[in-house]
């Protein structure tokens, strides 16, 4: 809808690591993409706990992964033994 009115989009990605991957792909495909806002602490410290290949910004730019799907390599050890790990971060 924004594109139809010549308005830029600026996704904010403060959700989980899969949202970060989806937003990177959205920004790559959107002709009216302006900027993607993300949280340094999350992609630098939290997302690597869940994902093997978190795209790290280089000189302010993120390259969307070219792997199948959204390109996320979820760590298989998170699903072993049926144990869920919960960590309070705030």
Language-model-detected regions and their locations in the chain:
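Shared catalytic-loop signature of beta/alpha-barrel
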Residues: 1-61, 65
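C-terminal extensions of enzymes
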Residues: 50-90
